[in-house]
Structures are given as C-alpha cells and as structure tokens.
Design a protein with these regions (language model features):
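Short, charged recognition helix plus adjacent turn
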Residues: 9, 15, 34, 60-76
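Short alpha-helical "recognition helix" segments of helix-turn-helix
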Residues: 21-22
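A short, Lys/Arg-rich alpha-helix, primarily the initiator
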Residues: 1-17
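DNA major-groove recognition helix of helix-turn-helix/homeodomain DNA-binding modules
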Residues: 45-60
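Recognition helix of helix-turn-helix/homeodomain-like DNA-binding domains
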Residues: 26-41
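Short, solvent-exposed alpha-helical "recognition" segments
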Residues: 39-45, 71-72
C-alpha cells in the first residue's frame, strides 16, 4: 500500500511519539499506529488537529518533500 500520509515521519521530525499523539488526541495508541502505517486514515478534522498539535502546515502531513515543494512554489 502506498503511503497516503506522513504522520509517522513528521512525528519523528518533531521528536514526538505515537503514544504522545494518542494522549493529545484522546485516541488509543493502536489508532495512531494505524495512521502511522497508513493502514487507516484519519478524517480531515483529525488531520487538522494533528497538524495543529505538531505545529506544521497541514500539507506537510501529505507532501513527501514539503520543503522542496515550498521552494518550488517560491520560484513560480
């Protein structure tokens, strides 16, 4: 299965754990694990809350090379 979201990678980049995110979101660690492995996807409202908690733009949770994406947009 192709990765749809980058939650696992962004958690790593922010030095946060899936257990931390589960606690902040009020869901089980198993639920966050499913999001991190892309075996299930959170709904849009949940994605927005995750982005807020991790202090990232929502696009960073989906675009693989977000920083490169931003640079390419600045050149346009």
């Amino acid at each position: 299965m192709e990765d749809i979201n980058r939650i696992k990678m962004v958690l790593f980049e922010k030095n946060k754990t899936a257990r931390w995110l589960a606690g902040e979101m009020g869901v089980t660690p198993s639920t966050v694990s499913k999001w991190c492995t892309n075996s299930s996807q959170p709904d849009l409202a949940t994605i927005l809350k995750i982005a807020d908690l991790l202090e990232v733009d929502i696009r960073e949770l989906f675009v693989r090379e977000y920083k490169q994406y931003l640079l390419s947009q600045e050149k346009k």
